[in-house]
Amino acid sequence: MSFIYLFFYTIADGGQRIMSNWYTADTHFGSDSKEVLARDNRPFKDINEYTKEQVRIWNEQASSDDTIYVIGDFCNCFPKLENDFRSGLAVSKQINAHIILIIGNNEQRAIDVYFDGSFEKFREYCLNDPSCKFDDVKLNDYVDIKGEKFFLTHKPTDHAKDCQTLFGHTHRYGGLWKPFGFNVGVDLNHFRLFSDDDIMFMLGQKKKYWDEDMAINS
């Protein structure tokens, strides 16, 4: 099966990357995440190779002063496979940048099964357990990118009527964009992080071309 990947680069004057915020979703780190690799045809021989390459890419793109927003499903979680989600969350220790995790359905599954349904207990684990390195864990969030407000939430629903949404959840199957926002899933950007400039480029294309094309073809 062939794939179409978007491969965005953010290069400042002199070739130096200066972006401070990055976005991704649906990484599904974890010791038993091989089914995700197979289902999405991710081009890695096993979960160890996949994880190693993702860590390399993230640390190459984002500096220790930058912030990566992971918009859900950082980890994989299946009932009765507790080590799966814990090993997935532990990948955060290998990342140099700050990480803000937005809860996805896999994190919610871990909350329901292993943390008595308590978001706060899960958040405390992510922030304080020695195996993890997260700066914050949130149900959703807002960010301002060059004067434009964006709502960050895992599932692709038109939650915020006053701004665009950055989401994940559908992997590559839902496409790159919806009328209400953009899919920043890892499968949509050749396994690289989306930058602020990438988001603004897509917003410009959406306003200039994509919305009009949708109106013509609807």
Name the predicted role of every residue range:
Residues 18, 217-218:
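Non-catalytic terminal accessory segments
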Residues 18-20, 24, 147, 179:
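Sequence-level motif detector for i,i+2 pairs with an aromatic at +2
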Residues 117-217:
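Conserved beta-sheet core of the metallophosphoesterase superfamily
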Residues 11-13, 63, 216:
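Intrinsic disorder/low-complexity segments
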Residues 24, 29-139:
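Core catalytic region of metal-dependent phosphoesterases/phosphodiesterases
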Residues 19, 64-66, 97-98, 148, ...:
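Short coil/turn segments at beta-strand junctions that form active-site/ligand-binding loops
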Residues 22, 69, 100, 166, ...:
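Hydrophobic/aromatic beta-strand patches that form the interior of the parallel beta-sheet core
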Residues 1-18:
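Short, Lys/Arg-enriched N-terminal segments with co-localized hydrophobic residues
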